[in-house]
């Protein structure tokens, strides 16, 4: 991954912020590059220097969230649900604008589904070591139940529980 200079980082940040504001109001397939650029106060050539279209911009935001999620899981004991929820909430706090639009209040979010899929292999591998007598079916079922439960705690309870 190439290092971006400050101007490019700023431009991408403004485009992402503008896109997320529009995404609060309407679905991605109804957002135009012209609208994003008008809100960002940038011209379309600048937009196209960074992204091919609004879907590419959304994919970039989603990938940043996936990367942040992956980093938040690196140092967490996957058996410690409290630590896992705290790590996820920390990631949401650090990426609040994108998470509020793409994840929170949206249990069918594609980002959320990608996060669940990302954590599955490592979680099951960890549990396989911790629970050597568990069958693959048991481990799969355990992951399904825990990931769906965690997903709902995060999506439905973020604002409620983060205040505590």
What are these regions (language model features)?
Residues 9-12, 16-20, 24, 29-33, ...:
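An amphipathic alpha-helix adjacent to DNA-recognition modules
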Residues 164:
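Short acidic-glycine-tyrosine-enriched beta hairpin
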Residues 87, 107-133, 137-151:
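Amphipathic alpha-helical packing segments from all-alpha helical-bundle domains
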Residues 20-24, 70, 93, 124, ...:
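Short amphipathic alpha-helical interface segments enriched in basic and hydrophobic/aromatic residues
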Residues 78-97, 144, 148, 152:
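Amphipathic alpha-helical segments that line or abut small-molecule/effector binding pockets
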Residues 1-8:
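N-terminal intrinsically disordered/low-complexity leader segments
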Residues 99-102, 127-130, 157-161:
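Secondary-structure edge/capping motif, primarily at the C-terminal ends of alpha-helices
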């Amino acid at each position: 991954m190439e290092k971006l200079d400050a101007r490019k980082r700023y431009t991408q940040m403004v485009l992402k912020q503008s896109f997320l504001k529009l995404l609060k109001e309407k679905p991605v397939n109804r957002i135009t590059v012209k609208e994003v650029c008008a809100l960002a106060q940038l011209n379309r050539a600048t937009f196209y220097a960074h992204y091919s279209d609004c879907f590419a911009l959304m994919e970039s935001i989603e990938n940043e969230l996936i990367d942040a999620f992956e980093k938040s899981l690196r140092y967490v004991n996957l058996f410690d649900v409290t630590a896992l929820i705290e790590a996820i909430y920390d990631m949401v706090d650090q990426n609040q604008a994108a998470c509020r639009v793409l994840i929170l209040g949206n249990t069918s979010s594609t980002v959320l589904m990608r996060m669940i899929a990302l954590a599955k292999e490592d979680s099951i591998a960890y549990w396989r070591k911790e629970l050597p007598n568990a069958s693959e079916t048991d481990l799969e079922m355990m992951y399904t139940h825990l990931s769906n439960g965690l997903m709902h705690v995060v999506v439905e309870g973020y604002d409620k529980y983060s205040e505590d």
